[in-house]
Amino acid sequence: PGLGSGWGALSEYAVVCDPKAPWPGGAPDCAFAQTVLDDDLDPVDATMIVTFREVLSNIRYFGIQPQDSVVVFGCGPVGLTYLKFMSLLGVKDLVACDILPEKLEQARNYGATHLINSKECDVRAEVRKLFPGGVDYVLDAAGSPAIVNQGMGLIKDRGSVLCYGVPEKEEVTIDFSPADYNWRVIYQQMPRKREEGEAHAQVVEWMRSGELNIKDFISDYFTFDQAVEAYQKLLDRKILKKGIITF
């Protein structure tokens, strides 16, 4: 009682569960995402595997296929991971949108086939030039409710706007006047832990094959004494990729 083990959250202690143990009524959901790391994996950098597993399990849940076209809003570490993983899974039509030129240039190295600066141009016009009938998916990797409405004018009939993570507000007003007749909005605030655990093997396989370099997604390291500085840097948007606090 009073103890949890869903995530770290700077905890000093954690409860680790074994899903294969004979739990009365079955193992708790969190147990399926608690995976023992192989000895050759750096436990500091391996914190990035949490994002990797969440993203891969979300791609599977969303149902994105190699033949699909996807517009990704937000080229931070999460958006870059989506681009990289969809590229590894064979998706050829990947459009990256961001307001920062330096992040867009990064996106090209992670699988993006088209770059759009959403601050400098009309995103809908640019996307429709590339895909006159619209795209299959618009993915919000930035956590902005405005992207839901922006995406309505980008997707094809029966296309989907996909939202990953916790939105700024717990309500969204959807203006679907720019959309075709049929559309979907899917929110995935957190993947189920069993699905996250099932993604672990593929992530590690990509790492071992050299197709996925974990350090490509980390830009900053901080000691625990620098934790306040780290969070301030995050709030000031000065961490380009992932920042890790070491203990």
Regions found by a protein language model. Name each.
Residues P132, L162, P167-E170, N213-F217, ...:
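C-terminal capping/lid region of NAD(P)-dependent oxidoreductase domains
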Residues P1-S69, F73:
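NAD(P)H dinucleotide-binding glycine-rich loop of Rossmann-like/cofactor-binding domains
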Residues T35-D42, V72-C75, S87-Q150:
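Adenosine-nucleotide cofactor-binding segment
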Residues R60-Q65, L130-P132, G153:
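Glycine-rich helix-loop-beta junction characteristic of Rossmann-like nucleotide cofactor-binding loops
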Residues E54, V78, M86:
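Hydrophobic/small residue at the entry helix of a nucleotide-binding pocket
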Residues A125-R128, P132, E170-D220, V228-E229:
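C-terminal substrate-binding/catalytic core of Rossmann-like NAD(P)-dependent dehydrogenases/reductases
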Residues D68, G159-S160, W183:
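Glycine-centered, small-residue-biased loops immediately flanking beta-strands
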Residues I155-D157:
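Helix-to-beta-strand junctions that scaffold the AdoMet/dcAdoMet cofactor pocket
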